[in-house]
Amino acid sequence: MFKITREEIEWGGRTLVLETGKIARQADGAVLATYGDTTVLATVVGERKPKPGLDFFPLTVNYQEKTYAAGKIPGGFFKREGRPSEKETLVSRLIDRPIRPLFIKGFKNETQVIATVVSHDMENDPDIVAMIAVSAALTISGLPFLGPIGAARVGYIGGEYKLNPMIDEMPESALDLVVAGTADAVMMVESEAKELSEDIMLGAVMFGHKEFQPVIDMIIRMAEKCAKEPRAIDVKDNSELVAKVRELAESDVRAAYGLKDKGQRHEALAAAKDKVKSALCNPEDPNAVSETDVGGVFKSIESDVVRNSILDTKSRIDGRDLETVRPIVSEVGVLPRTHGSALFTRGETQALVVATLGTGDDEQFIDALEGTYKENFLLHYNFPPFSVGETGRVGFTGRREVGHGKLAWRALRAVLPPKTEFPYTLRLVSEITESNGSSSMATVCGSSLAMMDAGVPLKRAVAGIAMGLILEGERFAVLSDILGDEDHLGDMDFKVAGTQEGVTSLQMDIKITGINERIMKQALAQAKGGRLHILGEMAKALDTARPEMGEYAPRIEVITVPTDKIREVIGTGGKVIREIVEKTGAKVDISDDGTIKVASSDGESIRKAIAWIQGIVAEPEVGKIYEGTVVKAVDFGAFVNFFGPRDGLVHISQMAPTRVEQVSDVVKEGDKVKVKLLGFDDRGKVRLSMKHVNQETGEEIVYENEPAEQPREKREGGGGRGRRRERD
C-alpha cells in the first residue's frame, strides 16, 4: 500500500531521518523529518495554473506547533490550538526567506507550505528540523524549486563552534545563529550574539554552511529515488513588451532616479508608469497587454537603471557614495509623562521609541512546547501606513512587524542588566513615523536611547545598520544604510546591530541564488564602520544611562526573607499581603525562594511596605524596649501590638510598680505604651512589661531586690504545668 523512501544520516551527534511515501500522499510533496525524537511533517501543494493578475509569487508558509507533540493539552476554554504564537510566526518567516528566491522567475502559481511539529523531545529545537523537512518536500514535489537547501544552528560555547546545540546548552552559548543555503552559497542568516567580533560571526556562518552539506546530499539522494516529474511551467516571452516599455519609459525612469527626494521621485515614477499604461494598455481590447504585465516590466527597467548606475558611477539614488550614512538626529526625553523616550531620525527614516518600566505583575506568560515561562523584556514594533505616505489597515500586527520587533529585541538583549540587579519588567514600543529603509535598525538605535533615558543601566549603547548589495556577474557593490528603493531593487538585505565591542545581532536575506564569503566579509567590515559612526551620533544626545529613573517610573526594592516566613507575610488567604498593599499603596511580589519585590512610584510607600514586612519576619529581642499600641484589654492584662503585626501580653502584675485593681485604671484600647520584652512563656507567647519602662522617657526602670528576669527561648507549645506551680 505504501511506497516508502527513507534516508538516514548521523548529523551533529544525533540521527536525522527523512521519510516520504506514507503520510500525506495527496500533497505534491510530503516529508516526515525526525531529529532525535523531534519530528516535523512538511507538506507542499502548488496550484496547477497561475493566479491571474499577480505581479509576485503567491507563496504562503505556515509553521505550526501541536501541543500533543510535547504531551500537553492546550489551555483556555476551547482546548485546541488557536492563533499562531510569536514563535510560530517567526519560524514561518525563517522557512520562507531562504526558499522564496529559489523558485524560478515568472512562476505565479499559488503555493502553500505547511510544517507541523508532531513530536518534540525537549532537546532539539523543531525550527531546523522544519526547514530541512520543507526543503526535502519541495525538492521531490515537481515544483520549479532550484534547491535543495540545508539549514543548521550554530552555537559558540567555550570559544568553539557547536553544531545544533541542544536546548539546555543554549544558555551557555554566546551565539544563537541559524544559517540556511544551497550547496554553493548562503541564502539566509538569523542570529543573536553576546558582543562577538565580525570574524567570529563570519566564521559561524561558514561553519554552518559547511556542516549542513551532508543534509543537502541526503535530500538529493532521496529526490533521485522518488521525486515527481518536473511540472511544465508556462513562462511568457515578454521580450517584445520589454523593448516597448524601455523605449517609452527608460529616459523618464533615469530622470526620476536623479531626484533625491523620495516623494518627488515616486511621483515622477508614477507619472512615467501611467504614460506607458496609457500607450500600451486597452481594457476594451482582450488582446492588449495587462497593466500587471506592464507593471512587472516597468519594475525590471527601474532595477536595471538603478543597479547599472550604482555599479558604473559608485553613486547612489540620493547622491551618497557607497559607504556614507544618511544624516542622523537623536533626541531623548521627547515625551513628558513617559518613563523614557527617544526620537531617532536617519534621513527619511524615523522611529519614536518609548520605554516603560513595570513590576513582576507585568511580565508576559509564554506558553511554549518546552513549558510555560515568563518574559520580562518586551519590544513591540509598529509600522503604521502613514509612515510611507499611504492609507491602510490599522491595529493588525502582521508577520513583518513581529519579525522586525524580534530582530531589534535580539539586538538589545545582550546589553541588558541582569534581573538580580534590575528587577523591572521592561517594555519598548517603537512607532515608525517615517520609513525609507532600515526601520528595524532605527528601532534598535531609538530603543537603546529610550532605555538610557529611562535610567536602565545598559552595559553599552547599541546601534544597527542595514547593508545592501548590487551583484552583476563579477561586479558588485556593497551599500551602507540602504534606502527603501535600494532594498527593493537590490540583491541583499544585510542587517547588523551591535556595540563598540562587537555584534549582538545579524540578519541576512538574499534575493538571488546566494553570495559568497568574500562579499559577506566586505559587508561586515563596512557595517562595522557604519555602526561605530551611528553610535557616535547617538552619543551626542545621551552617551550613558541616566543615574536616576524618571519621575513617573516605579521604584522597585528587593529584600529577602527566610522561606519559612513566606506564609506569615502572605497570611491566611492572602489577608496580610492584601493589607500591606492596601495600606501602603505599594505592589508586593513574593517568589518561592523568599525574594520579595516591593514596587511603587512613591518612595515612602516602598519604605512603609518594607518596614511592615521586616516587622513580620523579624524576631523581637528579649530585654529590648518597644513602643506599642493597646489592642485589647482583658481582666488579667492588656494585649499590646508592639512589633509590626506581633502582639504580646502585659500581665496586670506588670502594668505598674504598685498593685493594680482594674486594667482599665491604667490603659484602654488605642493607648500608646512603652513595653519591655521579658521573654516567652512555655507556649511561645510573648510576655511584656510596662512597669519596667518609664512611660514618659522610654528609659528602663530597674527595681532593687527584684529577681532578674531569666530570658527563656521561644518555645512552640508544650506543657509546663509544674513550672507554672513553681512561679505561683
From Swiss-Prot:
GO terms for biological process: mRNA catabolic process; RNA processing. Residues 697-728 are annotated as: Disordered. SMART domains: KH, S1. Residues 623-691 form the S1 motif domain. Residues 709-718 have a biased composition (Basic and acidic residues). Residues 554-613 form the KH domain. GO terms for cellular component: cytosol. GO terms for molecular function: 3'-5'-RNA exonuclease activity; magnesium ion binding; polyribonucleotide nucleotidyltransferase activity; RNA binding. The keyword Transport does not apply. Involved in mRNA degradation. Catalyzes the phosphorolysis of single-stranded polyribonucleotides processively in the 3'- to 5'-direction. Belongs to the polyribonucleotide nucleotidyltransferase family. This is Polyribonucleotide nucleotidyltransferase. It comes from Parvibaculum lavamentivorans (strain DS-1 / DSM 13023 / NCIMB 13966). The gene is pnp.
